[in-house]
Amino acid sequence: IYIINKNQMKNIIKNVITCLLLICPASLHAQQTARIMSLNELFSLADTQSKTIKIYESVVSGAEKDISVAKNAYLPSVEFSASATFNGNALVADRDFSNGHSFSSPHFGNNFAIEASQVVFAGGAIHYNIKALEIQKRIREWELASHKQDVYFLLTGYYLDLYKYRNLLTVYDRNMEQTRQVIRDMHAREAAGVALNNDITRYEVQYQNLQYKRTELVSSINICNDKLVTMLELPKDTEILPDTTLLSSNMPKPVEAEFQDIAYKNSPILNKNRLALDMLSKKEKVIKSGYMPQISIIAGDNLKGPITYEIPTLDNNINTWYVGVGLKFNIGNIYKLPKDLSRLRSSVEQSHNELASAEESVSLDVNAAYTRYLDSFELLKTQEKSLQLARENYDVIANRYANDLVLVTDLVDADNLRLSAEVQYVNAHINVIYNYY
């Protein structure tokens, strides 16, 4: 009969509990709907699902409707009116209000009138007002692009964090398996009388630390996954798996001038400022159109009764119609508009300064981002070399420990150094991608 001593029983229980802990998260995730997604797929989903993007798409749609409303000014205006009245008797008196006489009048009165007018000249006010609204719509489109960038960048951060945590989970799982193997080997060495129980305890403590770190990683993965699922309006049970080819892809290394040129042409803030200047130019022309008269073609018809300009009043209807040209000019614009133009020119100067400031800011931001991007490659090379050295160091220390040439503390230190190097390498690789985006 094989008798299990107390220490062996304790180790068996620990191993069983560990296996259960490792299996449980996997079984929980298995109940979820796993979905491998690339960054471009996230962006496409965000375009249709993101609440933030939908808000600014509504703003663009509203700007389109503003243009449609403004174009109504090109259409003719048609007005119709109708009224029914009760008319009293007419009173006629001398100019000094003496000798007044009352004349009976028909008491029912009616009035039907219709008038149509078409503006044929307004000094360009309608045309330039529509042009200003079209520019306003383009500004709203760049605002939409800016907020899309914000959403994309937020998604990229969550996605790369999720990728990093999953890679780190693989690193920790591998190190935990190696730690379990070391513990098994130490138990064998203890049974042979060449290792102390204290040596095993050190590695068991390290294993427990790794287990806790793994639990933290699983929690971080769930948090990032929930954020992505919520932003993209996906089912709550969706488990997003990052595209594993991302790390193997070669990141481009264009010169800074290329990035500067792209930013100069495509930066939402720069394009918004340029369009703001263009819109102010159109508004200036709208204001100047106020110095010009407005000319319209008009036509109308009027049917009314009774005929009150005859005495006695005639109980008849009379119909009149007319066609002509109307001229309207606001004389007050002569002394009011110069102040409006002065205020507008101040706004133009301010917009020029804002554009220059924005160009400078974008240029500095691109330079800083490009510098960090290049630095991330250098960091990756450094961490890659550190990982190589840490692995070589661990292999040497493990071999020496197997031959009783070093203490277990040296082996633990070497193992910790290797784990740290592996973690830093994964972080450095993800950092390159993050700085690129």
Give the residues covered by each predicted segment.
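Periplasmic alpha-helical coiled-coil/stalk elements that build and connect Gram-negative outer-membrane
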Residues: I3, M37-E41, D150-I262, R372, ...
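Bacterial N-terminal signal peptides that target proteins for export
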Residues: K6-I17
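A glycine-/polar-enriched beta->alpha junction
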Residues: S44-K54, S61-P76, P106, A113-A132, ...
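Acidic, low-complexity, intrinsically disordered peripheral segments
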Residues: I1, Q31-Q32, Q424-Y437
